């Protein structure tokens, strides 16, 4: 889809929610799939001071073009399946709010709270809606990383966030041919960890095992769903390949949906 990037930019400009949600793009879907993207935004947050380091791992740069990647995956999924996924995407800059952290680590001023709360309220609302409609569901948290620039990294907190999926379908749902990472590997992508390991073997890359979103909404919680963090290398988000990355990711998710969520 050569038109992917222009369509994505247009959607980011015109499709928003109200109030604090003006800084959050939300779209209800028809698939039992939620795409979240907390780190791709570029907008300032009124009355919210920029974050400052507090002695912990601190990043205030956006995950470049992950907003466009998430948008592209959603559009491609609609093309493939005839149904749209749910989408929650930050438009606010990470230097103000890191929505993939607990509230006490995510921002540094009271004026930021409304936007942070609205982002997570949207995710929770969609999870509640999906759980009322479908027996199984999956959340994919979209991120970017530079440590493995040509690779896609899996983060499930070593299987904890996909506990329900593992219990009903086994490790092949994470590493098998119709798993998302099985499809990535078959398409020629480098993946970390490799699919010759068991998800509970604690082999996910240090620092990329899954953040707050996956930990909070994963299926190890009674009110959660299966959740996985997808970390896309910088090279896979380059302007000349991001459309293909989105297409291949949507195809992988569609295959997973057909096998494990229908």
Q: Language model features by range: what are they?
A:
Residues 15-17:
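N-terminal signal peptide c-region/cleavage motif recognized by signal peptidases
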Residues 1-8:
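Sec-dependent signal peptide recognition
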Residues 11-13:
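Alpha-helical transmembrane-bundle signature of multi-pass membrane transport and export proteins
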Residues 19-262:
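N-terminal catalytic or cofactor-binding beta/alpha core of small enzyme domains
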């Amino acid at each position: 889809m050569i038109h992917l990037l222009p369509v994505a930019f247009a959607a980011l400009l015109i499709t928003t929610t109200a109030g604090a949600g003006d800084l959050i793009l939300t779209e209800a879907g028809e698939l039992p799939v939620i795409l979240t993207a907390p780190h791709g935004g570029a907008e300032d947050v009124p009355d919210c001071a920029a974050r400052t380091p507090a002695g912990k791992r601190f990043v205030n740069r956006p995950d470049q073009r992950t907003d466009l990647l998430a948008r592209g995956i959603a559009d491609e999924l609609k093309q493939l399946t005839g149904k749209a996924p749910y989408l929650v995407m930050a438009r606010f800059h990470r230097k103000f709010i890191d929505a993939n952290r607990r509230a006490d680590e995510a921002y540094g001023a009271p004026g930021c709270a409304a936007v942070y709360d609205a982002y997570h309220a949207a995710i929770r609302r969609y999870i509640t809606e999906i759980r009322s409609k479908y027996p199984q569901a999956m959340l994919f948290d979209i991120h970017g990383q530079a440590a493995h620039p040509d690779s896609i990294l899996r983060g499930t907190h070593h299987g904890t966030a996909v506990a329900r999926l593992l219990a009903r379908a086994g490790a092949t749902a994470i590493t098998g041919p119709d798993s998302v990472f099985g499809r990535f590997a078959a398409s020629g992508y480098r993946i970390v960890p490799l699919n010759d390991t068991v998800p509970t073997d604690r082999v996910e890359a240090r620092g990329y095992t899954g953040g707050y979103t996956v930990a909070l909404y994963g299926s190890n919680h009674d009110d959660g769903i299966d959740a996985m963090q997808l970390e896309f290398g910088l090279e896979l988000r380059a302007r000349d390949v991001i459309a293909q990355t989105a297409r291949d990711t949507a195809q992988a998710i569609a295959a997973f949906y057909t096998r494990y969520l229908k």
